């Protein structure tokens, strides 16, 4: 009996010591501005269209699918629970994709036994637009993703990401599991929020570009729109790119090449055809402006930029082979936010200084000569966007960039942030925090990788896209941009000096 009591006491002491060690590990020591001076380079790698649950919903210690309390059961247009998930819709008119079975009303594993679609396989694209995204969130209930999606039940799919290279990197450094995309909707608006924490303006936009809303400030549906999501995706009267009061919210093209709008036949080939209604050049202050005002070096590097410039300046009759062309890099012109701003117009010194090709980014890493702040946008085939890219290729590409930085002289004073512009229409169970008219919206993955990142850590601090701008602003003592959200963190919760 004495030995049993002794063993029990030793066990209790060991348990107490282990809890003390754990407690010490999570004691927060606020990061000081002096400590931040150790970070000389900030690298932001901006992937595409993945919700947190879609890639990291099974990550140990994260707020994942097993913790979901909201939106697990999706509801129909009338608010009643769906008997099953809608079919995965493809084509016009939409029909059920025969490669997917009928799925029960709950999240499902894309690479699991029911569906057998590993993350090396492309899936179809899903709607990810301003008004639809808000309707899917449904006031924080997160239960109308399937009903509003043009891809039906696909929205509820997720992967076991444990074999991803980035997953293994997240295990070594910090994964932020409450990082939210800056704005409702798609890539165009979220890239603008990365650049300026602002929504672009389009005064006097043509009526054909303006969204048609109902009395509840939702997209107006056509009379023939299916009453039930099981009968097909919703049909809208006019799913425009501009709000009725003149803000650009869905994909609009730049007035400058590379653009999805070719040059005018009789115009300057550096510009897009003004008669086809590109977004007027914007004048809001960007994070780039704030950096330049303090003489701090920065650049936006885009995969395929030089090829796209050549492609975009061709005569309008020439076939595009790079911009939105899947047989090459599939350059996405609306993923280039600084190209929408007047300060970076063709012919300006600042354009030449700050808008650069992705190959220069990779070469600069090898040379150990990156600017203080570097944004990197992978080319279309490597950005993980559903519909034209798989997860695996982008995962390997981004992990390779991290490895290259770690091998370079840059590593010892660099902070790398890997995140995604938006959720790509995929469901996530965590409601976004209260914000403003524009966002924030769904959770997206965010990894913080640095010698100064906490190791093996899941950061539950609420962040959004503007948190990156907030960190850059604090580190380099910049004038804050007005749209940066004060209630959200500045990423220093992921750091330890």
Which residues does each PLM region occupy?
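N-terminal pro-sequences and low-complexity stem/linker regions of secreted or lumenal proteins
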Residues: 22-497
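Bacterial N-terminal signal peptides that target proteins for export
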Residues: 1-9
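Bacterial N-terminal signal peptides
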Residues: 9-20
């Amino acid at each position: 009996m004495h030995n049993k009591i002794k063993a029990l006491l030793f066990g209790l002491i060991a348990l107490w010591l282990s809890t003390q060690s754990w407690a010490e590990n999570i004691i927060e020591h606020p990061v000081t501005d002096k400590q931040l001076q150790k970070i000389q380079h900030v690298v932001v790698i901006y992937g595409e269209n993945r919700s947190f649950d879609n890639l990291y919903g099974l990550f140990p210690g994260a707020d994942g699918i097993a913790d979901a309390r909201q939106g697990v059961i999706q509801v129909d247009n009338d608010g009643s629970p769906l008997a099953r998930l809608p079919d995965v819709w493809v084509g016009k008119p939409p029909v059920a994709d025969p490669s997917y079975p009928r799925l029960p009303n709950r999240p499902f594993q894309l690479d699991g036994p029911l569906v057998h679609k590993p993350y090396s396989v492309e899936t179809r694209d899903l709607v990810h637009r301003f008004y639809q995204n808000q309707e899917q969130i449904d006031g924080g209930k997160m239960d109308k993703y399937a009903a509003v999606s043009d891809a039906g039940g696909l929205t509820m799919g997720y992967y076991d990401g444990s074999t991803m290279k980035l997953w293994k990197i997240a295990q070594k450094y910090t994964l932020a599991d409450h990082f939210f995309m800056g704005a409702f909707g798609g890539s165009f608006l979220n890239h603008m929020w990365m650049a300026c924490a602002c929504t672009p303006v389009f005064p006097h936009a043509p009526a054909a570009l303006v969204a048609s809303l109902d009395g509840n400030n939702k997209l107006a549906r056509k009379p023939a729109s299916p009453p039930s999501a099981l009968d097909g995706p919703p049909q809208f009267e006019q799913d425009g790119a501009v709000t009725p009061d003149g803000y650009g919210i869905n994909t609009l093209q730049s007035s400058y090449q590379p653009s999805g709008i070719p040059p005018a036949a009789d115009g300057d080939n550096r510009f897009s055809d003004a008669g086809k209604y590109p977004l007027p050049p914007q004048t809001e202050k960007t994070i780039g402006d704030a950096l330049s005002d303090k003489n701090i070096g920065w650049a936006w590097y885009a995969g395929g930029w030089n090829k796209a410039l050549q492609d975009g300046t061709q005569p309008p009759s020439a076939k595009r082979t790079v911009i939105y062309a899947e047989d090459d890099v599939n350059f996405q012109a609306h993923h280039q936010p600084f190209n929408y701003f007047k300060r970076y117009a063709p012919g300006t010194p600042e354009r030449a200084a700050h808008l650069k090709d992705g190959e220069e980014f990779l070469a600069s890493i090898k040379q150990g000569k990156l600017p203080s702040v570097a944004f990197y946008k992978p080319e279309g085939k490597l950005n993980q966007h559903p519909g034209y890219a798989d997860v695996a290729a982008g995962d390997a590409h981004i992990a390779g960039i991290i490895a290259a930085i770690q091998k370079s002289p840059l590593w010892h004073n660099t902070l790398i942030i890997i995140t995604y512009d938006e959720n790509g229409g995929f469901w996530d169970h965590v409601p976004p925090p209260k914000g403003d008219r524009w966002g924030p919206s769904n959770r997206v993955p965010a990894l913080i990788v640095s010698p100064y990142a906490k190791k093996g850590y899941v950061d539950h601090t609420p962040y959004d896209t503007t948190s990156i701008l907030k960190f850059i602003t604090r580190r380099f003592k910049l004038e804050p941009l007005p749209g940066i959200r004060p209630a959200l963190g500045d990423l220093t919760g992921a750091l330890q000096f």
